Amino acid sequence: MAKYNDAKCRLCRREGTKLFLKGDRCFTDKCAYDRRPYAPGQHGRVRKKMSDYAIQLREKQKVRRVYGVLEKQFREYFVHADMAKGITGVNLLSYLERRLDNVVYRLGLANSRVQARQLIRHGIFTLNGHKVTIPSLQVNVGDSIEVPEKNRKISVVADAQSIVGRRGCPSWLELDASTFKGVVKALPQREDIQFPINEHLIVELYSK
């Protein structure tokens, strides 16, 4: 699987917005985007006029990077979203939100989606009582995500819960912090996604 090895803060500066890729650091004055809110490189401060295609492409890249999804899988999500009932763009965001790694992050059981993927691959969580190691699994209403007791002392899990209040737990999820257990109460709705995303641009890009 392809992997981005450059500084993650450069991605935020490239997209012109915080992508919250580094967990707790993004909420501090150490955030590189807060200190240098312009694109990286020698000509980063120069604003270039963008074509409609470039605007659509940047929006797609931004969303891909937020959720940590490669192009092939992102396009597959779009195909499924386009075939499903409802609005294609909203369906696409729902598929991304229902990824297990995103749910673990949203519950506050990991500092970032990157960390959530690492923890899942190491078998730290259970899904409906069964050990799971696939970050891209889609959760459904009624599913429960839990940290078994033997894994609750892992520092990154315990530390993550201390900052969940800063970003909040979405209404479609419920967390019992005392038992490290989260439940999917409902499917995510468009209004549950507070991050600035214009999904219509992505639909236009893939519809060409």
Curated annotation (Swiss-Prot):
Keywords: Ribonucleoprotein, Ribosomal protein, RNA-binding, rRNA-binding. GO terms for cellular component: small ribosomal subunit. GO terms for molecular function: rRNA binding; structural constituent of ribosome. Residues 98-158 form the S4 RNA-binding domain. It holds the Pfam family Ribosomal_S4. GO terms for biological process: ribosomal small subunit biogenesis; translation. Part of the 30S ribosomal subunit. Contacts protein S5. The interaction surface between S4 and S5 is involved in control of translational fidelity. Belongs to the universal ribosomal protein uS4 family. HAMAP family: Ribosomal_uS4_B. One of the primary rRNA binding proteins, it binds directly to 16S rRNA where it nucleates assembly of the body of the 30S subunit. With S5 and S12 plays an important role in translational accuracy. This is Small ribosomal subunit protein uS4. The gene is rpsD.
